[in-house]
């Protein structure tokens, strides 16, 4: 991986995950600048030898790569002073949810190489899944750098059409919360059966972890086969799945993901 000077605008959880992931891969700390108005966040990075600043314009001006790691609702405000900076020879990466490449180039008109990224919170433990999109103005070299950057905290996947970023949002960006809610419901059910909260959590989290590992380590088996392999006719698993199916579980999941996509599309028009 090339060691370009990268400036992070925003030092929140996702920026922290990426920066610390890069440092674990021996990326030079002095090649990273993090801009954030919060003194405690800056101190967190400074302890690792990372350069910090409160002057976004000065930091961005010297950077080769700029990563926007702020909430979509404040992106326009953050980008306003940055529009005076010449981005023509810089790689611009955005992890702001629902912000299109077209919108980014409208906010920063001189930007040529732009990569839109949809990461997810498992990046905080090095198990992220990030969807990436770049238009034809972004070189192969810039694409490779963006991919290497996000690979520091998990896996990456390029989509050919920006429209597919909405599906990526539903599939990985938001989906950790779906899994958490399912685990939460299972845990509460076990508590209602008399188990302690700790025991209930240990049972459900290990079941989820083991199931995910079975999926990863058996790529030759489709998901329905894995499910069927656990489900004996007339058994306990079948009884549980029958209840889920009676309540149209698959339809509920599809409706939830479609709602996520609809909101993602709506956000493109809001910010």
Could you describe each region identified by the protein language model?
Residues 33, 39, 48, 56-61, ...:
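Rossmann-like NAD(P)(H) cofactor-binding subdomain of soluble oxidoreductases
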Residues 32, 42, 59, 196-204, ...:
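Small-residue helix-packing motif on alpha-helices
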Residues 2, 205, 209-271:
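NAD(P)-dependent Rossmann-like dehydrogenase/reductase catalytic/cofactor-binding core
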Residues 1-54, 58, 62, 127, ...:
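NAD(P)+-binding Rossmann beta1-loop-alpha1 motif at the extreme N-terminus of oxidoreductases
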Residues 103, 107-113, 129-167, 178-218, ...:
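Internal alpha-helical scaffold of NAD(P)-dependent oxidoreductase catalytic cores
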Residues 115, 164-170, 223-228:
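Short pre-catalytic strand/loop immediately N-terminal to key active-site residues, enriched for Gly-Thr
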């Amino acid at each position: 991986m090339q060691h370009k000077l990268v400036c992070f605008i925003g030092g929140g959880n996702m920026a922290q995950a990426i920066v610390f992931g890069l440092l674990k891969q021996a990326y030079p700390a002095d090649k990273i600048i993090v801009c954030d108005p919060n003194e405690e966040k800056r101190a967190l990075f400074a302890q690792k030898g990372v350069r910090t600043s409160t002057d976004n314009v000065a930091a961005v001006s010297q950077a080769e790569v700029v990563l926007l790691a702020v909430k979509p609702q404040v992106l326009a405000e953050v980008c306003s002073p940055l529009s005076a900076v010449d981005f023509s020879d810089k790689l611009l990466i955005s992890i702001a949810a629902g912000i299109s490449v077209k919108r980014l180039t409208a906010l920063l008109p001189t930007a040529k190489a732009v990569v839109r990224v949809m990461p997810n919170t498992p990046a905080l433990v090095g198990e992220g899944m990030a969807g990436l999109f770049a238009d034809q103005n972004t070189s192969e070299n810039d694409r490779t750098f963006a991919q290497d950057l996000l690979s520091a905290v998990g896996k990456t996947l390029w989509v050919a059409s920006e429209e597919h970023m909405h599906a990526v949002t539903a599939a990985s960006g938001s989906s950790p919360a779906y899994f958490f809610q399912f685990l939460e419901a299972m845990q509460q059910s076990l508590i209602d059966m008399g188990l302690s909260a700790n025991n209930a959590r240990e049972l459900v989290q290990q079941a989820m972890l083991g199931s995910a590992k079975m999926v990863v380590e058996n790529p030759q088996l489709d998901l329905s086969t894995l499910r069927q392999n656990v489900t004996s006719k007339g058994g306990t698993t079948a009884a549980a799945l029958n209840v889920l199916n009676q309540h149209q579980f698959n339809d509920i999941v599809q409706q939830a993901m479609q709602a996520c996509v609809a909101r993602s599309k709506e956000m493109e028009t809001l910010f």
